[in-house]
């Protein structure tokens, strides 16, 4: 399990020192997010929110890739994994067909969903809020405000890289985006798992 709230877990990631308050949080309510697979009342869970611009390409890809990773490790009951947008442009839209196609090719399951926007109150609920690029990070901080608990990070920082996960909405290269998402999610899982 994670260390208690009063015990900070410190780790150096991509040259930056992060002091995580890895809190023991209990699942006592549902939020408006539509991507929960299951919630077990009273169970201790790690809560991750992936964020991109529209919540139809990269963040939803990361959501399903991370769910696949934790499931393959027999830990699906230890995580709540969701995704959201910084913008309102695609609210209510399902996952982009290009993301579905690459997930199909990689044998990763996904469910029908609706894009939602990140909100300020998500900060108190989630342990990690993970952006895909520098623009996402600016917009996340604009929505959330002060990151007092060091919860907000860029995905590839966990792979000791400072670069962005490219938006396939523009590049149309969903395979390269998938490779970056898989790398980032794998390293994020390894990081979290080292404290469980």
Per-segment meaning from a language model:
Residues 1-2, 10-17, 22, 28:
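Composition-driven detection of intrinsically disordered, low-complexity segments
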Residues 3-5, 9, 13, 37, ...:
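Acidic, Ala/Val/Gly-enriched low-complexity intrinsically disordered segments
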Residues 20-44:
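Short, Lys/Arg-enriched N-terminal segments with co-localized hydrophobic residues
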Residues 36, 41-125, 190-196:
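Conserved active-site segments centered on acidic
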Residues 52, 103, 130-131, 181:
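Hydrophobic structural packing positions in well-ordered secondary structure
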Residues 122, 128, 134-196:
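Phosphate-binding/catalytic loops
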């Amino acid at each position: 399990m994670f260390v208690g709230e009063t015990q900070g877990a410190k780790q150096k990631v991509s040259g930056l020192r992060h002091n995580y308050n890895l809190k023991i949080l209990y699942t006592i309510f549902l939020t408006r997010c539509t991507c929960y697979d299951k919630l077990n009342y009273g169970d201790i869970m790690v809560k991750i929110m992936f964020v991109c611009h529209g919540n139809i390409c990269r963040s939803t890809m990361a959501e399903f890739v991370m769910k696949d990773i934790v499931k393959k490790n027999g830990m699906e009951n230890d995580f709540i994994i969701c995704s959201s947008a910084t913008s309102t442009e695609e609210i209510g839209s399902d996952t982009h067909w290009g993301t579905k196609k690459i997930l199909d090719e990689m044998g990763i399951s996904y469910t029908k969903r609706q894009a939602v926007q990140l909100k300020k109150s998500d900060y108190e609920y989630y342990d990690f809020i993970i952006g895909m690029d520098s623009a996402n990070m600016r917009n996340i901080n604009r929505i959330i405000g002060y990151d007092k608990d060091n919860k907000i990070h860029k995905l590839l920082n966990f792979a000791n890289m400072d670069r962005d996960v490219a938006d396939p909405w523009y590049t149309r290269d969903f395979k390269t985006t998938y490779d970056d998402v898989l790398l980032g999610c794998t390293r994020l899982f390894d990081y979290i798992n080292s404290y469980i």
